[in-house]
Amino acid sequence: MHVYSVTPESASRQREFTQDYLTRLRETGAACERAGWSGILVPHNLHEVDPWLIAGQLGAATDTLVPLVAVQPSSLPPHTAAAMAAAYATLYGRPLHFNLVAGARDDELRRTGDRLGHDERYERMREYGLVLRALLRGEEVDTEGRFYSYRGFRLEPRPEVLSQCKLFVAGSSPASIGVARDVADVVVTHPARYPEWEETFLKPLLAGGYTGELGIRIGIVARSAGEDAWVTARERFPETWQGRQETLLKTVSQSAWSRQLAVDAVAEAAAAAAAAASAESGESAGAAGEKEPDVYWLGAFRSGHASAPFLVGSHQDVGSRLAEYLRAGVGHVLLNGSYEYDHEDIGRALLAARRAAGS
């Protein structure tokens, strides 16, 4: 199992930072290496620091960590992305991976003038991925596409380590599954609860001919006692009026995974409210108050401060739930919103997952 942390936020509405961003970034990278994790996700958002500058700092501050750099095709052409990977490999003697994203925030797409529809953005991503993969392999690119055209272009210089770069494709829609089949080394999704994820994502993916690796983006809050994990999770991701409104807006997002998570998050909140009302009225004879919360939790997404579901509970409970995905073939776990002092507890949950999955 390959585990990836995520770069720290440069700014937050929730937290006041006592250290400058560069210090926090370097400490996060060092903590990931100590934990034995494979890499660190570097997101692409208009409100975050440029991902390529971040990747360079991580290369300078770590020895083995591999940045997983999010790339939105509208932000730079594939030959530039390949050249950036070549520069990174020349400086630090190791590859980096690419997380190809179509864009999940409708507001950012509008602000940058990206007017392509959902499926068109994935058509562009397919062309992008095919060109990028060819350049990383050292092939000459000669193509006339709808979005990209090249005449006898080859990446030079090209460090041999670029052959180890992987393309991750994020998404869960039929359009993204088609692109994953054609260009992805690893397909990544923000998973639903395991039975639904298997039925609505994994089976269609495999039926469509995908033969690559699997990844999931998920957060973890784990403690020795499940009750302590829930206290931490609810303090860290408090529900607010603004968060609920943002979640409602996401129910009509163009992004399939964001839209589905939002719909599920609203349903989860409604079910919890109904259970609380039932307990107050005495209809459940106290049973509702004694029921353990589900390990799979969308409250962090609903708060507006996380983009993925979370697994919350004891190390064993979180490990058991994560193991369901591992047994299905997931080999890459991209963590969402892990705090620097969470690494030890996350490591224990990951170890429990490996044991439960028999890996």
Language-model segments: residues:
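Alpha-helix-loop-beta-strand connector modules within alpha/beta enzyme cores
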Residues: 51-72, 124-128, 210, 347-359
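Active-site-adjacent beta->alpha loops and helix N-cap segments on the catalytic face
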Residues: 48-55, 193-207, 343-344
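An alpha-helical appendage that flanks or caps ligand/catalytic pockets
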Residues: 112, 118-159, 197-324
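N-terminal beta1-alpha1-beta2 module of alpha/beta enzyme domains
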Residues: 1-66, 164-165
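Catalytic domains of carbohydrate-active enzymes, especially glycoside hydrolases
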Residues: 24-43, 179-187, 324-331
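Acidic (Asp/Glu)-rich catalytic clusters
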Residues: 30-34, 55-64, 85-96, 181-182, ...
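Active-site mouth loops of central-metabolism enzymes
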Residues: 3-23, 70-74, 161-172, 223, ...
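Hydrophobic faces of well-ordered beta-strands that scaffold small-molecule active sites
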Residues: 1-8, 40-42, 65-71, 96-100, ...
